[in-house]
């Protein structure tokens, strides 16, 4: 049993998940703040603490794509993707890490990607952001150990709104639960 705060730039999907959780007897809230906005992240953390009293788990899973080959990519697209994936993870983690230290407990999950670990044509921005979170995860695992804070990374693959245009249609049947 746990409680869920679904946060992100688009509240519709999060609100649907919140409704499902509540309809099944759970507790959940949503927050449409962007992980790139310092004030929005602070408000998200305050809302979560106000509703649930503590933060035990943080899952960093915000994501966007702006795919183009590196020589054709604008710097604004590169920076935007890195800002969401890497700096969004940094900002949310930085906001909850002191809370978890004080609680002497915390679990942080960051999502990475095979694009960060191995590269993928047209995803230099995405790959840079996703590899950056791996470096941060490795360091925070060491720094958090004495406070019972565990930090891990997952490199999932799924059929989502973000990936549906990247995969062949037959992949949907294999990746939809």
Stretches with model-predicted labels:
Residues 11, 32-46, 75:
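The beta1-alpha1 cofactor-binding region of Rossmann-like NAD(H)/NADP(H)-dependent oxidoreductases
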Residues 69-70, 74-79:
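Substrate-binding pocket helix/loop in short-chain dehydrogenase/reductase
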Residues 118, 139-149:
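Active-site-adjacent segment of SDR/Rossmann-fold oxidoreductases
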Residues 116-119, 124-132:
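The catalytic Tyr-X3-Lys active-site helix of short-chain dehydrogenase/reductase
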Residues 93-94, 138:
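A short, exposed helix-loop element centered on a Lys and neighboring polar residues
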Residues 24-27, 47-60, 66-69, 105, ...:
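A glycine-rich helix->loop->beta "capping" turn
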Residues 113:
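Residue(s) in the substrate-gating loop at a strand-loop-helix junction
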